[in-house]
Amino acid sequence: MEKKKILDAALAPRIISGVPTDGQPLSGGPLSWAWCHTTLKRWALMKTRPYKYPLSTEPPTPPSVPNSASVNHNTTTNTTLSYTRCHSTTYTKPLRERSSRPWTRSATISRLPPRSWTN
């Protein structure tokens, strides 16, 4: 009985960490949980701050234009222009909002009388 308790205590940390006694990792082990957690975190950051934490380092690719003879150069440039215009607004909007805060703060400070008047 005492031997079994000692054995259970020795195996407890291994079982908790997601690795059973036979050495096969469980499907819901800490490795898969950590991977899932970091991926979800990355997605959440990308949704809230896309300009700061892009999912990949590559710039967003414009929509592919069908490679046929009927498509001329003008239609290709139009699609890429509209795409970049759409994306530039999405990426610069949070930056513009953030830069507007110190502007209002400085305006309120400049409205206050000089320090020499209060002394």
UniProtKB/Swiss-Prot annotation:
GO terms for cellular component: cytoplasm. Residues 81-92 have a biased composition (Polar residues). Residues 55-119 are annotated as: Disordered. This is Putative uncharacterized protein YCL042W. It comes from the Eukaryota.
